[in-house]
Amino acid sequence: MWIQRDPLGVALVIAPWNYPIQLSLAPIVGAIAAGNCAVLKPSELAPASSAALARCIGEFLDPDAIAVVEGAVEETQALLAQRWDKIFYTGNGRVGCAPPPVVSPTIVARFCDCML
């Protein structure tokens, strides 16, 4: 078996409020394992989990490889306006299935796991 790691660059992970730790860390682990850097935006609806993730990731992981941005809709929109090589979104179908112009026009890949 041949495995070739081909990092994409910087991934944005927008995580949901239900299972906030697991659904935040699973895509982050995959992104980092593949050689990418990642930015995590945990749900504002789980503030204790969001704060714990920000504290632990900031304390124990390389800040050059992974960052956490806490906030609500305004912060999420600001993140989506940036250039990303991959966006991994888990959450509401209304938001996740938004037309591509809502996100950065330079996006290479977008993965949405939505509940419709």
Whereabouts are the PLM-identified features?
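Rossmann-like NAD(P) dinucleotide-binding subdomain of oxidoreductase/dehydrogenase enzymes
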Residues: 1-116
